[in-house]
């Protein structure tokens, strides 16, 4: 019985014993390409030539044993990113539990960049939630690079290949979101000028999430309009990127305008970003947010003003604010007036 360390979301511990796969799993997390690389002995770009069911096993998830089918897949390799350099075909094993869990299936014809872990001379999927990420058939790199940078080059190729479908491009952006390097940011900037609206907005949201505000102005008009149904997901991602990533004081003028958006999530993200700047230039915008129709936005304004002006005693907990909202709003409105 040998230990097989697989990443399942954040981590998984697994045991291989006589064809059975026994895993102690945590809930699936976001894709983390750097972690996926670290847990993989081989990374190959290619296409699945065949998949065969080879037996039965057991998967234990959160202390519950679940029966699973064992499969063997044969991968036709286009190029190796990490691992045996001369491989043209690779075989690996994966498991699909009988119960509905977030393991990804693998089928003949599936293509991409596959991440594999070697145990006793056999390859297994490194992460059943993310067995592969986006890649295209052709991608040339003229210089030797660290593995993370090589993976980034592959994702960039997936974004710039004119024959790549939109689903591949969106998958590449999802993977690039977790790579916090300059080459990854540069690749996202290319995607941010894509003729595809879905690709462009997804890339801009990813850039905002890393405090890259060069394209914030290009989505300002969209965020200031009522959200059309098909764009709901895109606007939510943009608002989330602003909330979690933007802290550059140069964004303050646009953030102030976004406080007038008809969409609550956009206003909330803008208020949080103003707070995150930590700049005295954000005070005017936060003062405006004190009058927002949504309590969450008003609370962010109060906390942001307290942090920026270093008045900790007027930065209440959410519970304290809920009980005494009028008291805190009155203080900050009067304070703002006194500064004029």
Label the predicted regions:
Residues 313-340:
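Terminal, low-structured helical/coil segments at or just beyond the last alpha-helical repeat
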Residues 95-175, 182, 193:
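Extracellular C-terminal loop/segment signatures of secreted glycoproteins
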Residues 62-92:
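OB-fold (S1/OB) nucleic-acid-binding surfaces
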Residues 176, 180, 207, 211, ...:
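Alpha-solenoid repeat junctions
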Residues 172, 203, 234-239, 270, ...:
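Conserved hydrophobic register position within alpha-solenoid helical repeats
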Residues 148-160, 181-193, 212-226, 246-260, ...:
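Amphipathic alpha-helical scaffolding segments comprising HEAT/armadillo-like alpha-solenoid repeats
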Residues 164-167, 182, 197-198, 228-233, ...:
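Alpha-helix N-cap/helix-start positions at coil->helix boundaries
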Residues 51-58, 81-83:
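Short, conserved beta-turn/loop elements at beta-strand boundaries and strand-helix junctions
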